From Swiss-Prot:
Keyword Aminoacyl-tRNA synthetase: no
Keywords associated with the record: GTP-binding, Nucleotide-binding
Protein family membership: Belongs to the TRAFAC class TrmE-Era-EngA-EngB-Septin-like GTPase superfamily. AIG1/Toc34/Toc159-like paraseptin GTPase family. IAN subfamily.
Pfam families hit by this protein: AIG1
Species in which this protein is naturally found: Rattus norvegicus
Domain of life from the UniProt record: Eukaryota
Domain AIG1-type G: 5-216
Gene Ontology MF annotations: GTP binding
Signal peptide: none
Protein name: GTPase IMAP family member GIMD1
Binding site for GTP: G14, K15, T16, Q17, S18, G19, K20, S21, S22, S35, H147, A148, E149
InterPro entries registered for this protein in UniProt: G_AIG1 (IPR006703), GIMA/IAN/Toc (IPR045058), P-loop_NTPase (IPR027417)
Length: 216
């Protein structure tokens, strides 16, 4: 293993049309995952993107460390064509296959900032994370808000948006120690935003002392 290289394993989970595949592409700086607007679910199978290599991303022990990001894209839950049982089995199998030995550093629960988070759909999202990650899910989950430009269009700051969030969303944020990230679809440089998001993800991982969630 290269001592000057670090591999970070991530998974994107969430509702259909929440922007999981698009978010995965931003993290990778590529187009590994097929993403388009559609009235129903687009992603039907899990797939691993690993095209992201950033040289000299950070320093450790006086040495520059290169970063490789691996992102597992997953079908939406609930899915417009697949049963809930099928989606759970597909994602669980993929987590075990891709991260069974190396482990998962962080799961990103993707949620559109311009959509409400409450009721049964909110419960389903949290339940999915709990079932897939087990009792330690709170330590390995962050919320990724997509379409964050809608917040500014509404005349709100990120802080004001969170203050006005539903009880269900606030409860979830409290559960994951307020680990959250905002992803802007417009008005920001993709490359700059990508680096900022990865730096924030690394902060979360450092807070976890680089521990991983194993699926063996």
């Amino acid at each position: 293993m290269d001592a000057n290289k670090m591999i970070i394993n991530l998974a994107v989970l969430g509702k259909t049309q929440s922007g999981k595949s698009s978010a995965g592409n931003v993290l990778l700086g590529s187009a590994d995952f097929y993403s388009r607007f559609a009235p129903g679910s687009v992603t039907k199978d899990c797939s691993l993107g690993r095209s992201c290599h950033i040289h000299g991303f950070m320093r450790r022990g006086g040495h520059e460390i290169s970063l490789q990001i691996q992102v597992l894209d997953t079908p939406g839950y609930p899915h417009s064509k697949l049963s809930t049982r099928c989606v759970k089995q597909e994602v669980k199998k993929a987590l075990e296959h891709h991260f069974g030995q190396e482990g998962l550093h962080l799961a990103l629960l993707v949620h559109r900032a311009d959509m409400p988070f409450f009721g049964q759909e909110a419960s389903d999202s949290v339940q999915l994370i709990q079932e897939l990650l087990g009792d330690s899910w709170k330590n390995y989950t962050a919320i990724l808000f997509t379409h964050a430009e809608k917040i500014k269009e509404a005349g709100l700051s990120e802080e004001e948006y969170l203050c006005e969030a539903s009880d269900a969303l606030l409860t979830l944020l409290n559960s994951v120690q307020h680990r959250h990230i905002f992803l802007y679809e417009r008005g920001n440089s993709w490359s700059e935003q990508r680096i900022k998001i990865l730096e924030r993800i690394m902060e979360f991982i450092k807070e976890n002392h680089f521990q991983v969630l194993s699926f063996t």
